[in-house]
């Protein structure tokens, strides 16, 4: 399967949709686009399949006499795309299981057509992980640990900006708390809406918790850890999960679609894997939590201080924030019950995590 993918450096601090069938005319245009772009590579296409064609990120499977390759149009700002392209090349050449990048005829890792960058990758065959199966859950967490470890040492070429979130968490907490406060004004304007009524009744306590969590983070080893990591940072995938991983032959764990990578503490990816998964059950599942953490630590152990930082970050109401944002920013018509479930999960999660801190 295809990836769906400081000297002389600018440092930039950063703060799955369904595919509709393509018309025959659109498919023909996309195939012609691929044929045109591929002229820049030593690739003789025998057949071209459009894999993803209704999004800004386009993906083709290109069949050649020596096997399949993947052509992708990257839907990212150019500076961000370059950071991730060179990161993927670094990891592949280091032996990490990420799709290798095929240079074009000029020796470049990418070609630019219009305002987009195009890249040709190795085509990876494998199956997606099933996270209800313990062995798959362990595999995917071990793959994440290997990714973090292998990424240490990456520095983009001169002129390519560095994308980092190191040291930015306290600001992110503050921003989200302010947004949840501002959204009260939107709820006030919808006083007849049950979702908004519940939001106004309950949200203040969670905003206060978020600010207390920020203070707790600053009192932990978060700051010294980030300062230490800035000297030799690892990458965070930031979108790690079943959509961006594959289990290949001989239990090879492949990490694909590195478009979102950034420098940050490795525990960011752990939190983004563990907390949403447990949220799907409606209860705090200690067994699943421990399976995931133990599998990761079997490849990349964390110190007790590092785990404390992770538990504090997990306390922040990210999942609740996402539900509220869906309502007031994306204007989705959410029922009151969805907010009730989000509030309840935050309470369950907090009770479990406070026993670990």
UniProtKB/Swiss-Prot annotation:
Its main location: other. GO terms for cellular component: endospore-forming forespore. It is found in: Spore coat. SUPFAM superfamilies: Protein kinase-like (PK-like) (SSF56112). It holds the Pfam family APH. GO terms for biological process: sporulation resulting in formation of a cellular spore. It comes from the Bacteria. The keyword Flavoprotein does not apply. Keywords: Sporulation. Signal peptide: none annotated. Belongs to the CotS family. This is Spore coat protein I. It comes from Bacillus subtilis (strain 168).
């Amino acid at each position: 399967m295809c990836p769906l993918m400081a000297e002389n450096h600018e440092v930039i601090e950063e703060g799955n949709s369904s595919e509709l069938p393509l018309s025959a005319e659109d498919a023909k245009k996309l195939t012609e686009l691929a044929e045109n772009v591929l002229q820049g590579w030593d690739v003789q296409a025998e057949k071209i399949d459009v894999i993803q064609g209704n999004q800004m990120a386009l993906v083709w499977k290109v069949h050649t006499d020596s096997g399949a390759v993947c052509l992708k149009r990257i839907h990212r700002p150019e500076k961000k795309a370059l950071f991730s392209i060179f990161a993927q090349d670094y990891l592949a050449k280091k032996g990490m299981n990420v799709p290798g990048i095929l240079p074009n005829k000029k020796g470049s890792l990418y070609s630019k057509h219009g305002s987009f960058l195009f890249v040709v990758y190795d085509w990876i065959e494998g199956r997606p992980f099933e996270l209800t199966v313990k062995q798959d859950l362990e595999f995917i967490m071990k793959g994440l640990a290997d990714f973090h470890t292998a990424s240490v040492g990456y520095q983009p070429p001169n002129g390519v900006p560095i994308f980092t979130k190191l040291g930015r968490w306290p600001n992110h907490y503050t921003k989200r708390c302010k947004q949840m406060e501002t959204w009260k004004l939107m709820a006030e304007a919808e006083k007849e809406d049950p979702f908004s009524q519940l939001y106004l009744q309950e949200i203040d306590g969670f905003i206060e918790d978020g600010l207390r969590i920020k203070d707790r983070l600053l009192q932990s080893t978060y700051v010294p850890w980030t300062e230490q990591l800035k000297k030799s940072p690892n990458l965070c995938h930031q979108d790690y999960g079943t959509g961006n991983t594959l289990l290949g032959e001989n239990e090879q764990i492949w990490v694909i679609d590195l478009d979102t990578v950034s420098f940050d503490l490795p525990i960011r990816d752990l939190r983004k894997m563990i907390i949403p998964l447990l949220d799907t059950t409606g209860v705090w599942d200690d067994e699943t939590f421990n399976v995931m953490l133990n599998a990761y630590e079997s490849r990349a152990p964390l110190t007790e201080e590092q785990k404390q930082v992770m538990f504090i970050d997990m306390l922040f109401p990210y999942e609740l924030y996402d539900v509220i944002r869906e309502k007031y920013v994306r204007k989705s018509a959410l029922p009151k019950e969805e907010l009730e479930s989000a509030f309840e999960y935050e309470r369950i999660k907090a009770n479990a995590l406070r026993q670990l801190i």
